[in-house]
Amino acid sequence: MDRLDDTDERILAELAEHARATFAEIGHKVSLSAPAVKRRVDRMLESGVIKGFTTVVDRNALGWNTEAYVQIFCHGRIAPDQLRAAWVNIPEVVSAATVTGTSDAILHVLAHDMRHLEAALERIRSSADVERSESTVVLSNLIDRMPP
């Protein structure tokens, strides 16, 4: 798909803000008919711009009250695919990325409490060639949003 135009971006912004809005409601906001909005949304779905629709649930309501960012330092060099394979089946790891700097990767980890976090960290450290890790526990989230 070519670069999104301003109208596509406005449609995406409306969907991000009001996911349950009808095509007619979105069309009213972006000055298009409901069928025109539907065509654009369908095109963005087919091209992979929109990856799907989901429900966002407050993690605290599900008991995931402890959050940490974990820097991972590995022995020697390790391929990103190996790191992904080591952590993809650990449900507490909600995101993982390779990074620049002294660490090899950073993980975003959720847990029910500190004991659960400690158990998750043990599984994380034992599942790859990890030399050491440094964890930073989140006290409060100040900003949590999607990009504009």
Curated annotation (Swiss-Prot):
InterPro entries per UniProt: AsnC-type_HTH_dom, Dimeric_a/b-barrel, Tscrpt_reg_AsnC-like, Tscrpt_reg_AsnC/Lrp_C, WH-like_DNA-bd_sf, WH_DNA-bd_sf
- Tell me which Pfam families the record gives: AsnC_trans_reg, HTH_AsnC-type
The annotated modulation of its activity is: The DNA-binding activity of Rv2324 is modulated by interaction of Rv2324 with amino acids. Aspartate is the only effector amino acid that completely abolishes DNA binding. The majority of amino acids induce a dimer-tetramer or dimer-hexamer oligomeric transition. In response to amino-acid binding, adopts an open quaternary association, which is a part of the functional requirement to bind to non-symmetrically distributed target DNA binding sites.
Free-text disruption phenotype from the record = Down-regulation in strain H37Ra reduces growth and lowers M.tuberculosis survival inside resting and IFN-gamma-activated macrophages.
**What GO molecular function terms would the record report?**
sequence-specific DNA binding
| Domain observations | Contains an N-terminal DNA-binding domain, followed by a linker and a C-terminal effector-binding domain, which is also involved in oligomeric interactions.
Q: What is this protein called?
A: HTH-type transcriptional regulator Rv2324
Starting at the broadest rank, the lineage of the source organism is:
Bacteria, Bacillati, Actinomycetota, Actinomycetes, Mycobacteriales
